[in-house]
Amino acid sequence: ATAICYFDPVSSPTIVAAEWYRAWGLPASRQAQAAIKGPIAAHLASGRVLPLIDDLVNSGMSVVGVGALEDLREVKAACRDRISILGNLNGIAMTRWTPAEAEIAVKKAIAQAAPGGGFILSDGHGEIPWQVSDEVLHAIVAATRRWGTYPLQAGLADGA
């Protein structure tokens, strides 16, 4: 595998206090990480990650999965040059998107998190609902190819 994703949904500060994660979740994560030979992505099942970025970086994670509720600009600032970002398209909202709305969401995510590298566009939870239309999925792919190729286009600077 290129990387392993370590899903740890209960450790997000959305669900438990960050202190609890540091006391119980982080030691369990480090134990699991020791058995994995290669890059690891931490995914807290679409919960908030910002309060734990330093912990995830210090634990040796290479990538952090970011949920749709997180501000990508804030996460990017906290992660810059230390850990890559995976996310954060809203899979639930995708079920109602038009292709045009899909392009707007992709462009916005890329504008907020891709400059300088270290960003992998994905949904924000680790699975896309089957109710998302093929048309929207194809629009996401097309928009990613259009807006997510380096060097990034100057039109992305405004994030809209």
Residue ranges and their predicted role:
Residues 1-160:
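Active-site loop segments of alpha/beta catalytic cores
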